[in-house]
């Protein structure tokens, strides 16, 4: 399916699972690198520059990368995409009616990472600030992190209440506003969210084999030293994209050589 941006000639940079980054040459990667839900264009990539506000698609790309390369297959961790969180939070009526459109068996996940945005309830992609909430099933708790003085606290609380029925819990959940290192400008909320996702994911994975002994209120505490700097996050994502792009080029080259060889063999028969 083409988007308006594709029709206008944006370049394909990379095709990675549920995310496409456009540049001049497309390529066929192995099955493990193919899927399409959303598109990253050059304007999206520009949000990685210092001082720029990270948009939805870059956060989705990072989540996709973690799912495919970092999280063990037997770990039941869910990364809800920003658009899905918006739908759950603001759709009218009973949230259970949305189940067919949501990831199956949400009640079975050990942890759910939930990006929060202060956007207009009636307009997607309209917010100005990101925060992050992590649901931990073992303690029925939503840990809420905000790098701008709990700017999105009410949005986080609303999202947690809307998500609760989908989790089919037998006991009430806790919403825990967690102390969070604060950003020093108005543009680093998105990269801070990525840093927090990385750290809390690491903490949860590290504790998987000793669940009965884990004090989640301790391991989910976040301090400044635990977070990557905004520059580190931006550089890491840029580097990630370049490495995947190189894999794409290598795959393209191999596919092209294979195709040429096959064609030549056919002509010689």
Task: Indicate residue ranges for each PLM-predicted region.
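Long, low-complexity, serine/threonine-rich intrinsically disordered regions
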Residues: 252-267
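Cysteine protease-like catalytic core of ubiquitin/ubiquitin-like
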Residues: 91-250, 267
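Cysteine protease catalytic domains with a Cys-His-Asp triad
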Residues: 1-131, 135-141
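Intrinsically disordered/low-complexity terminal segments and short unstructured peptides
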Residues: 2, 150, 259-261
């Amino acid at each position: 399916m083409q988007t308006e941006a594709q029709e206008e000639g944006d370049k394909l940079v990379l095709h990675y699972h549920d995310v496409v980054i456009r540049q001049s040459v497309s390529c066929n990667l192995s099955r493990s690198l193919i899927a399409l839900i959303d598109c990253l264009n050059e304007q999206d990539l520009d949000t990685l520059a210092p001082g720029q506000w990270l948009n939805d698609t870059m956060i989705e790309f990072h989540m996709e990368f973690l799912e495919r390369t970092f999280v063990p297959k037997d770990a039941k961790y869910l990364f809800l995409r920003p658009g899905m969180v918006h739908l759950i939070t603001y759709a009218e009526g009973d949230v259970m009616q949305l189940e067919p459109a949501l990831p199956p068996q949400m009640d079975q996940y050990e942890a759910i990472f939930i990006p929060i945005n202060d956007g207009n309830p009636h307009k997607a992609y309209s917010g100005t600030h990101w925060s992050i909430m992590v649901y931990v099933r073992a303690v029925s708790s939503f840990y809420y992190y905000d790098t701008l003085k709990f700017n999105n606290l009410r949005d986080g609380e609303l999202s947690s209440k809307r998500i609760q029925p989908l989790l089919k819990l037998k006991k009430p959940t806790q919403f825990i506003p967690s102390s969070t290192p604060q950003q020093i400008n108005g543009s680093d909320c998105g990269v801070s969210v990525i840093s927090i996702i990385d750290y809390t994911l690491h903490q949860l994975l590290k504790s998987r084999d000793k669940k009965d002994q884990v004090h989640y209120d301790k391991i989910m505490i976040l301090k400044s030293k635990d977070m990557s700097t905004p520059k580190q996050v931006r550089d890491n994502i840029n580097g990630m994209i370049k490495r995947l792009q190189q894999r794409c080029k290598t795959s393209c080259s191999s596919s092209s050589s294979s195709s040429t060889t096959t064609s030549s063999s056919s002509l010689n028969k």
